[in-house]
Structure formats: structure tokens, C-alpha cells
Amino acid sequence: MGLLNFKKKPSTTEAASPELESFLKGYSIEVMPRTAERVPSFQEILPKGTRVYIAHLEGTPIEDMVNTARRVAREGYTVMPHLPARIIKDQATLKDWLNQYQGEANVDQALLLAGGVVTPHGDFESSLQLLETGLFDQMGFKRLHV
């Protein structure tokens, strides 16, 4: 049995309280490409407009990240991929990744993180350094979470 059961459950006859509905309004979820592959349709389990963060773990190819972003966006959700500074080799790599996200999935938001690795794989070790490249402004990103 998986950690999370993504199968749609039959609805109960008991309605959620207004307080609970208010609390849950605007929530977000996080997926990884390999978990997203096991979800037949996000539309069956998520309300329209949910923000979906896509976790970028070390070793996950950018192509898998972009494919997941494209799929989630096509299903009608706001996509916010993780950009872990310490696994991005250099500014050219960052620009390439941003171009792929924008060109293939129309992404204009991102979560900037230092990342889970201790030793940087390249020029960046913090999310601030990603911001300092100026690429997010140049490329028209509308929302960044740091």
C-alpha cells in the first residue's frame, strides 16, 4: 500500500463545515514526477485551481520535471516547480531549465530553494543567488516563492 491513496473515494453524506471549507480553500499539494505517473487524472482528486508544486530531487532529469509540469498544466492546475540552487550547474543551465518550463508548460511561477544536497554541483548554493541572475525578471516570471 502506498503512502498516499490517490483513488477517488465515494463522497459521504455529511457536508464539510464552513470553517473546514474556509481552512482548506487555496491549499496546495506537492508531487514528484514518479508519483505523478501513478495518478491517472489529477482532475479526479484535486479541485480546479489547486497549486501543484513539483519537487525536484537530485538525480531527477529535467525532462521528467518538464513533462510533469506540462501534464499538470494541461489538466488545468497552477504549476510551481522547485528550482534547487545546489543542483543547478550554472546560469546557462538555469536559463535552459526556465526556457523548457516556459516553452513546454507555460510556467511563470517557481519555488526557489537551496536544495537538499550539502555540496553544490556548480555555481549556486542559495536561492538568493538564483534571484541575483535576473533571469526570472527577464523571462517574465510572475510569482516566486523563496
Please report, for each region that a protein language model flagged, where it lies by residue.
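Active-site beta->alpha loop and helix N-cap motifs at the rims of alpha/beta catalytic domains
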Residues: G2, K7-V146
